[in-house]
Regions:
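Structural signature of multi-pass alpha-helical membrane transport proteins
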Residues: 3-107, 166, 170-274, 336, ...
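Helix-loop junctions at the membrane interface of multi-pass solute transporters
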Residues: 77, 130-142, 267-271, 297-303, ...
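The feature identifies polytopic integral membrane transport proteins across all domains of life
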Residues: 82-89, 110-124, 141-151, 248-249, ...
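Membrane-embedded alpha-helical segments of transport systems
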Residues: 91-99, 124-129, 145-166, 186-189, ...
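Membrane-interface helix-loop-helix junctions at boundaries between adjacent transmembrane segments
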Residues: 104-159, 169-181
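Extracellular/periplasmic helix-loop-helix junctions in multi-pass membrane proteins
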Residues: 237-244, 297-315
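Membrane-helix cytosolic exit motif
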Residues: 261-269, 297, 311-337
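C-terminal hydrophobic structural anchor segments
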Residues: 264-297, 339
């Protein structure tokens, strides 16, 4: 999930088989538990100050790891197949944002301003790496193309997503990203990411050797961000403003967004003359949104705002995309080669 080096194919396949059987993402369960704990046991005073600093350090370390893991050579290797990657990037950073802007009418009539901000933010984050590659593999698509597209999306997403937030959310009045926020983006996100890229040749062997324990440090940092966000939301009384009806509407909206993007990417792949393996890349890489990148980035971009509510649409969308895409991947895998056009 998120900014990470492409996993080995055997690991990918085992994870997809698990997903396709149970349709439950263990990472999502951990995030839900962290959110519940933050809501039930909100911190304050000295503990809150310590938590805030720990969260900032965790986010910086997280993006340092992201930079060290992501191979720029891998991302640039597929430039020769630029048409494929252009379509995927257009789906991620053009189609999704346009859909998010078009849904402005939902607020405040059907959902709160904070939830709409979350929907728009969800539409601005980059694609995933691991699940995009995993589903492409199980669907018998162009795995090499998926690796390049997903990696490139994450590589530029670290820079493009904050830029889109500044441009789109400030102009629509959905969030305030001032100079202080931009400075936080540079200090907590961009500098650690660039440092990670620079030290990658020195540490990549160590990261690969200890990939399994580092994964838990990686995810633990994200869980800390979620706990802090929900703790702050509970302390500010934000959750009392949300109704079950709004959650239902939010879930329906996330389903409709995914359905629309899947429809457009499917049609685009066919109409633009891509073969089926490349169409699969466009469908799975172009429809994903990264939880691992989006959550910590939101904590920086929306500091002082109800982050717990803002990331809620991304959390819901992430689980929906896993369920739907796992089913689609199995359907592609079981297709009749003779009947495929």
């Amino acid at each position: 999930v998120g900014l990470e080096s492409p996993p080995k194919l055997a690991v990918i396949l085992s994870q997809v088989k698990f997903l396709s059987r149970f349709y439950i993402d263990g990472f999502i369960l951990g995030i839900i538990i962290a959110g519940v704990l933050g809501s039930v046991f909100p911190v304050s005073g000295t503990a809150e100050s310590i938590l805030n600093w720990a969260t900032k350090i965790a986010i910086g370390f997280l993006f340092l790891l992201y930079g060290a893991r992501l191979s720029p050579q891998e991302a640039w290797k597929g430039v020769k197949h630029w048409r494929l990657h252009t379509v995927v990037l257009a789906a991620t950073f053009v189609l999704f944002p346009l859909i998010g802007l078009a849904l402005r009418f939902l607020s405040p009539t059907l959902i709160s301003d904070e939830l709409y901000t979350g929907i728009l933010y969800m539409c601005l984050v980059p694609s995933t790496v691991q699940s995009s590659i995993a589903f492409t593999s199980i669907a018998k698509g162009n795995v090499a193309g998926a690796i390049v597209s997903a990696s490139f999306s994450n590589l530029i997403g670290v820079f493009v997503t904050p830029l889109l937030v500044v441009l789109l959310m400030n102009t629509t009045g959905q969030a305030t990203v001032d100079f202080s926020s931009i400075l936080d983006i540079v200090v907590q996100l961009l500098i650690p990411f660039i440092v990670g890229q620079l030290i990658r040749p020195l540490v990549i062997g160590w990261l690969q050797k200890y990939a399994e324990p580092i994964k838990y440090v990686d995810r633990g940092s994200i869980l800390l961000v979620v706990f802090a966000a929900f703790s702050e939301s509970m302390k500010e009384g934000i959750w009392s403003t949300i109704t079950i009806w709004q959650i239902v509407i939010l879930t329906i909206v996330c389903c409709l967004i995914l359905a629309l993007v899947l429809g457009v990417t499917t049609l685009a792949g066919r109409k633009l003359g891509f073969d089926l393996p490349d169409q699969i890349v466009i469908i799975f890489c172009g429809s994903k949104k990264s939880l691992a990148t989006g959550l910590p980035m939101a904590a920086v971009l929306f500091a002082g705002q109800p982050v717990g509510l803002i990331v809620l649409p991304l959390m819901i969308f992430h689980q929906i995309q896993l369920i739907v895409c796992a089913a689609m991947a199995q359907r592609f895998a079981n297709r009749d080669p003779v009947s495929v056009s």
